[in-house]
Design a protein with these regions (language model features):
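Flexible loop/turn connectors
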Residues: 296-348
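An alpha-beta-alpha
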Residues: 79-81, 97, 185-232, 330-350
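Extracytoplasmic "Venus flytrap"
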Residues: 74-98, 104, 113-124, 217-221, ...
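Hydrophobic alpha-helical segments within soluble ligand-binding/sensing domains
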Residues: 73, 167-209, 308-329
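Bacterial lipoprotein signal-peptidase II cleavage site
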Residues: 50-69
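Beta-alpha junction/loop-to-helix N-cap segments that form part of ligand/metal-binding clefts
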Residues: 113-175, 266-284, 288-293
């Protein structure tokens, strides 16, 4: 997948315009004329040298360099942030992103336009199209639907995703090898799925049937449960998928899973993350433990998780953004970045279910 942007006028073009204006000056004295011609020649040679040095850089790097020059002259970078929905994980990623950009560029040199799509894909599209119309310098797409909308809205403005699980799946890239190319890069919240399956075995070696609860409208959730299901079956478990279309049927589907299964696994899923109270209200009274794909879900309804820090994920994304805006990096050449994982458990829910965390787990704070 390659995305190209139109280049800016070359340095030679600019020098030619300078030369034209100098030649238009009516200089009568021969000595002054020679000085003027010498000046023209010097400017042209310098411009040609600069063009030769920068000829291999892509148009995205050139655009980023010009944005950096503008900010140095007192113009703020305009950064649009499209966040799919409000919940702890995405909120932390946005904060980490903003903090990193302020640290890297100076708070006075960056202006954020934050928009919450309220978990609506149509709103994601509207937000990103507005960013393009407003001429922002960079777009942060927080969560998969936000990234998909940003990719559809522009092939020119640099787009960074965060809280995106699998970029190949999200963008329909059959040949994805770690770098998207074009105007898109970012960070992934994909945890090691084989280790998540192994964590279920670590906590519940005697369980027989594992329910995989997820939103069918989120392709990254489908990807996760497919992989985890295969890993669980390798470990000898019966693994069954329970999909809900949206928050309206989550309660009924979760009730079915809790009635049928010994343990429930919930992947990194935006709809589940926004509705952990529903899941906890069903599973905890039923005595069915939940293993979660990320810390925000585990904090709301889970026993344990193989967790990443979404704040750190967002901060890494912000550091990438600073490099793009200042011309230090070309977004088309930046690979997707990942973060480290930590084993964590929910002390309150473990106490309620009479569970003791295995060695090596850290209690979730708050």
């Amino acid at each position: 997948m390659k995305r190209e942007r139109a280049g800016k006028a070359s340095a030679v073009d600019r020098s030619n315009r300078i030369g034209g204006s100098l030649e238009g000056i009516g200089i009568r004295e021969e000595t002054n004329m020679k000085k003027a011609l010498s000046m023209i020649l010097a400017v042209s040679l310098c411009a040609a040298a600069l063009t030769g040095c920068g000829g291999s850089a892509s148009s995205s790097a050139a655009a980023s360099s010009e944005a950096g020059s503008a900010a140095a002259a007192g113009t703020k970078y305009k950064v649009g942030i499209c966040q799919l929905v409000e919940h702890d994980a995405l909120d932390a990623a946005t904060k980490g992103f903003e903090d990193a950009l302020k640290e890297q560029l100076g708070e006075e040199n960056v202006e954020f336009d934050f928009q919450n799509a309220q978990n609506d894909t149509t709103t994601c599209a509207t937000i990103n199209n507005t960013f393009v119309s407003n001429g922002v310098d960079l777009i942060l797409a927080n969560a998969t639907p936000a990234l998909q909308a940003a990719a559809a809205a522009t092939t020119e403005i640099p787009v960074l995703g965060t809280s995106v699980t699998e970029y190949g799946v999200a963008l329909g890239l059959d040949d994805f090898n770690g770098t998207v190319g074009g105007n898109i890069s970012g960070t992934s919240d994909l945890p090691p799925l084989d280790q998540q399956a192994a964590m279920i075995q670590e906590w519940f070696p005697d369980a027989k049937k594992i329910g995989l609860l997820y939103c069918s409208a989120e392709p990254n959730s489908q990807y996760q449960v497919d992989v985890v299901q295969a890993e669980l079956e390798k470990l000898g478990y019966e693994a069954v998928q329970y999909s809900f279309a949206d928050s309206n049927d989550l309660s009924s589907v979760c009730s079915s899973a809790a009635a049928d299964c010994d343990v429930i696994y919930v992947p990194t899923d935006n709809t589940a993350a926004a509705n952990t109270g529903i899941i906890d209200g069903i599973c905890r009274p039923a005595g069915v433990p939940v293993i979660a794909g990320e810390e925000g879900i585990a904090k709301g309804c889970g026993v344990a998780t193989l967790s990443i820090s979404y704040y750190d994920l967002g901060k890494t994304t912000g550091e990438m953004a600073a490099k793009i805006l200042t011309g230090e990096a070309d977004v088309s050449e930046m690979p997707i970045e990942y973060t480290t994982v930590t084993k964590k458990y929910n002390a309150e829910i473990c106490d309620a279910l009479g569970l003791t965390a295995p060695e090596g787990y850290v209690a979730i704070e708050g």
